[in-house]
Curated annotation (Swiss-Prot):
Cofactor note: Binds 1 zinc ion per subunit.
Record keywords: Aminoacyl-tRNA synthetase, ATP-binding, Cytoplasm, Ligase, Metal-binding, Nucleotide-binding, Protein biosynthesis, RNA-binding, tRNA-binding, Zinc
Organism: Shewanella piezotolerans (strain WP3 / JCM 13877)
Gene name in the database record: thrS
The TGS domain, residue ranges: 1-61
Family per record: Belongs to the class-II aminoacyl-tRNA synthetase family.
Keyword Nucleotide-binding assigned: yes
Name of the protein described by the UniProt record: Threonine--tRNA ligase
C-alpha cells in the first residue's frame, strides 16, 4: 500500500501499486487530463510507470519546464512516425531534445527539399490530431534488437550493440505502427504534441564523426500552446532580421571566405567598431590599474607541455615546425603572461600585479561549428591575469566582478546570470587546491551579494571559474565574461615571489575576460542594436549632405570641423536628390544626418535629423558639435532628443 507524498506535503494512501496518472486522477479529472509525467523521488518517470513503494511525487504538466521538454522529445518520435509513413526506406538514427525544440537524424538517400518538409509537417499534424495513445513497453535487450532488426533499423541496432548493456531492459515507445527506443519519459498521448513547427534541414555526421555517413538532420520547435509557439516564431523572425552576418554585409563591416575559414576580414567600418571597442576596454584597464602587455603569437611545444595545455588541449591548437622545433599558435594568453611575470625578481610588495592583453588567439574549431563572428578560429581575447597572494584573492575577484558589471552596463546589458563552474573530471592540481579555489570564488560572489548557480564539473582543467551570461533584447543567453582562479599554472611554469618572511612562494593567478572574444562580442552587439550602434561606437557618427553643388564647400567645412572635434564625420556630395541621400544613409544606420542648403550655409547652421527620422531642427555647427561630443564622451545609448 504505497503512500504518496505530494509537493504540498499532503499524503495519499493507495491499496495497490499506482501510476502517476492514477494519482493525478485521484486528485481530480483536470489534473489527470493535464498529466504528462511524474517526478518520483526526484527521478522523471512516465505517467504509466508503476509506483509500488512509499514515494514523493510531483506531477508534471505542460505548465512545467520539464513537461515542455518531454513533449518536445515526443515530437521527435512523432516526426519519426510521420517520416516512416512517407519514406518507409529511411533509417532512423537519434532524435534528442535541444533548446526550444528537437531534431532527428535520418539516413535517406533522397535529399530532402522544402516541399518534403512541408509534407512532413502536414503528416505530423494529421497524426497528432488523432490524439493516439503512446504505448510504452519495457523489453529485454534481445527483444529490442530483434524488433529493430525486423524493421531494418541499423542505427538503433548499433546503439544497442555499442551503448546498451545486454542486461538492460530498454523501453520501446509504440506510436501506432512506429516503434522508437528511448530512456523517456514521453507524453502518454499525442494530444500534448499539437503546437510544433519544422524549421530546417542540415547535414550531420553519424555520431559527429566525419569518417561516418552524412545524415539529414531535421530541426523542429515545439511548445505547450499556440501562443508560446507564435511568440517563439516571432522572436526567430526578429532574430533573422538582426542576424549579424546579414547586417555585417549590408553595412560593409566584414567578410569571411573559404580560403580562411573562421578568420575575419575586417572592412573599414567594421575595423572602426573593433578599435572603438578595444579603446573602451583599454580605458577600463586604466581605471582598474592594469598593465597592458603583448605576447608572441606562437611558442615552442615544450612550454605548452609544461603548462599542461598540450596534454589537455593539443587537438584544439594549430602547430607548425621550423628548424626541427615544433611550435603551437597560442589558443590562449595565460602561459605567455606567466613568462612576462617571471622576468625579474618579484616581491610581495609587487602584488597584486594585473596584466592585460588584447591577445590574438587561434583555436582549431571544427569547420561545421563555425558561425560568422560568433564561432571563429582566429579571435582577439580581452584577456587579463592577476597575480596575487592568497589573502588578496577575494578582493581581486571582487574587483574583476565589478569591472564586468561596469562594462556590460555601458552596452545596456542588465540581465546577467552568474554561474560558478567547479572541478571537471580531467584536471590538474590536487583536491585541496580545488577546495580552496572554489571556496574563494564562492565567498567573492557572496560578499558582492550576487546570486549564482553552481555548474558541477564545468570548470576549466586548471581551475574553477565564474561565468557571466548576459541576456539580449530577444532574451537569448550569451556567455561572455569569466573570472577564474588558478592555483596550478603559476607553479607549473615556475612563477614565484619573495614573501614577507623572505621565502619563495607561488602566486595565485586569476584569469579574467570580460567580452571573451572581441569578434564574438561585436557579433552580439550587431544583433542587439540591429546595426543601430550607439553614437560613441558607430563607425560613422555623422553624415553631411548638400542639397545642391552650391553648398559643397560648406559641407566640406562642416565635416572638417567635426573631425577636428574627434567626431567621425563623412560627406555625401553626390548629385542626387536629398531624399535619396537621406534614405540611403538611414539604411546605413548613421546616427545623425545633417542637411545643408543655402539658408544653413548663410547662417552657419546644419539641419539635424536622426536615423530614426526625428527632426531636431537647425543648430549652429559648434552647438551641435558640443552636444554630440558630450553624448559621445558619456557613451550614451540614446540619440539626442528634440
Amino acid at each position: 500500500m504505497p503512500v504518496i507524498t505530494l509537493p504540498d506535503g499532503s499524503k495519499r494512501e493507495f491499496a495497490q501499486p499506482v501510476s502517476t496518472l492514477d494519482v493525478a486522477a485521484d486528485i481530480g479529472p483536470g489534473l489527470a487530463k493535464a498529466c504528462i509525467a511524474g517526478r518520483v523521488n526526484g527521478e522523471l518517470k512516465d505517467a504509466c510507470d508503476i509506483i509500488d513503494t512509499d514515494s514523493e511525487l510531483s506531477i508534471i504538466t505542460a505548465k512545467d519546464e520539464e513537461g515542455v521538454e518531454i513533449l518536445r522529445h515526443s515530437c521527435a518520435h512523432l516526426l519519426g512516425h510521420a517520416f516512416k509513413q512517407l519514406w518507409p526506406e529511411a533509417k532512423m538514427a537519434i532524435g534528442p531534445v535541444i533548446d526550444n525544440g528537437f531534431y532527428y537524424d535520418i539516413d535517406l538517400d533522397h535529399k530532402l527539399t522544402q516541399e518534403d518538409i512541408d509534407a512532413l509537417q502536414k503528416r505530423m499534424t494529421q497524426l497528432a490530431k488523432t490524439n493516439y495513445a503512446v504505448d510504452k513497453r519495457v523489453v529485454s535487450w534481445q527483444e529490442a534488437r530483434d524488433t529493430f532488426e525486423a524493421r531494418g533499423e541499423s542505427y538503433k541496432i548499433e546503439i544497442l550493440d555499442e551503448n546498451i548493456s545486454k542486461d538492460a531492459t530498454p523501453a520501446l515507445y509504440h506510436h501506432e505502427e512506429y516503434v522508437d527506443m528511448c530512456r523517456g519519459p514521453h507524453v502518454p498521448n499525442m494530444k500534448f504534441c499539437q503546437n510544433f513547427k519544422l524549421m530546417s534541414v542540415a547535414g550531420a555526421y553519424w555520431r559527429g564523426n566525419s569518417d561516418n555517413k552524412m545524415l539529414q538532420r531535421i530541426y523542429g520547435t515545439a511548445w505547450a500552446d499556440k501562443k508560446a509557439l507564435k511568440v517563439h516564431l516571432n522572436r526567430l523572425e526578429e532574430a533573422a532580421k538582426r542576424d549579424h552576418r546579414k547586417i555585417g554585409k549590408q553595412l560593409d563591416l566584414y567578410h569571411m571566405q573559404e580560403e580562411a575559414p573562421g578568420m575575419v576580414f575586417w572592412h573599414n567600418d567594421g575595423w572602426s567598431l573593433f578599435l572603438e571597442l578595444e579603446k573602451f576596454i583599454r580605458q577600463k584597464l586604466g581605471q582598474y590599474t592594469y598593465q597592458e602587455v603583448k605576447g608572441p603569437l606562437m611558442m615552442d611545444r615544450v612550454l605548452w607541455e609544461r603548462s599542461g595545455h598540450w596534454d589537455k588541449y593539443a587537438d584544439g591548437m594549430f602547430t607548425t615546425n621550423s628548424e626541427s622545433r615544433e611550435y603551437a599558435i597560442k589558443p590562449m594568453n595565460c602561459p605567455g603572461h606567466v613568462q612576462i611575470f617571471n622576468q625579474g625578481l618579484k616581491s610581495y610588495r609587487d602584488l597584486p600585479l594585473r596584466m592585460a592583453e588584447f591577445g590574438c588567439c587561434h583555436r582549431n574549431e571544427p569547420s561545421g561549428s563555425l558561425h560568422g563572428l560568433m564561432r571563429v578560429r582566429g579571435f582577439t581575447q580581452d584577456d587579463a591575469h592577476v597575480f596575487c597572494t592568497e589573502e588578496q584573492v577575494q578582493q581581486e575577484v571582487s574587483a574583476c566582478i565589478q569591472m564586468v558589471y561596469d562594462t556590460y552596463e555601458t552596452f545596456g546589458f542588465k540581465n546577467i546570470v552568474v554561474k560558478l563552474s567547479t572541478r571537471p573530471e580531467k584536471r590538474i592540481g590536487d583536491d585541496d587546491m580545488w577546495d580552496r579555489a572554489e571556496e574563494a570564488l564562492k565567498q567573492a560572489l557572496k560578499s558582492n551579494d550576487i546570486e549564482f548557480e553552481i555548474l558541477p564539473g564545468e570548470g576549466a582543467f586548471y581551475g574553477p571559474k565564474i561565468e557571466f551570461t548576459l541576456h539580449d533584447c530577444l532574451d537569448r543567453a550569451w556567455q561572455c565574461g569569466t573570472v577564474q582562479l588558478d592555483y596550478a599554472l603559476p607553479g607549473r611554469l615556475g612563477a614565484t615571489y619573495v614573501a614577507e618572511d623572505n621565502s619563495r612562494q607561488t602566486p595565485v593567478m586569476i584569469h579574467r575576460a570580460i567580452l571573451g572574444s572581441l569578434e564574438r562580442f561585436l557579433g552580439i552587439l550587431i544583433e542587439e542594436y540591429a546595426g543601430k550602434f550607439p553614437t560613441w561606437l558607430a563607425p560613422q557618427q555623422v553624415v553631411v549632405m548638400n542639397i545642391t553643388d552650391k553648398q559643397s564647400d560648406y559641407a566640406e567645412e562642416v565635416v572638417n570641423l567635426f573631425k577636428e572635434h574627434g567626431i567621425r564625420a563623412t560627406k555625401d556630395l553626390r548629385n542626387e536628390k536629398i531624399g535619396f541621400k537621406i534614405r540611403e544613409h538611414t539604411l546605413r544606420r548613421v546616427p545623425y544626418l545633417l542637411v545643408v542648403g543655402d539658408q544653413e550655409m548663410e547662417n552657419k547652421e546644419v539641419a539635424v535629423r536622426t536615423r530614426e527620422g526625428v527632426d531636431l531642427g537647425k543648430m549652429q555647427i559648434q552647438e551641435f558639435a558640443t552636444k554630440l561630443k558630450n553624448q559621445i564622451s558619456l557613451r550614451s545609448l540614446n540619440l539626442l532628443e528634440d
